Amino acid sequence: MDQVVIFKQIFDKVRNDLNYQWFYSELKRHNVSHYIYYLATENVHIVLKNDNTVLLKGLKNIVSVKFSKDRHLIETTSNKLKSREITFQEYRRNLAKAGVFRWVTNIHEQKRYYYTFDNSLLFTESIQKTTQILPR
């Protein structure tokens, strides 16, 4: 099966069922080093351990990302996603309101980094022992 199809299935599944332990174990199994998730377009740039890349194109469900920065909203939204109080799409919209343009999830470091349009780091969190979705 084509890598794009495999990764699309993995990302679609975690967006729906929010099973993060399964999600991260699948990414490790497929030798993912890290991935970059672009909030506005839902494009995902996956980097494998051998430095090959895979691009997953979003579904054209565009959201506007604010220029204002709100670290508290990021943390609150992330916690709500982990506790399944909100859906992944609500998570995505709230992060866009908080000024998140993209996030980078490093599988080896078990960290997620949230960045703004100007590439400044807004927030960092651990992805260990979480039950969160597409990158917390």
Swiss-Prot record:
It comes from Escherichia coli (strain K12). To E.coli YbcV and YcgX. It holds the Pfam family DUF1398. SUPFAM superfamilies: YdfO-like. This is Uncharacterized protein YdfO.
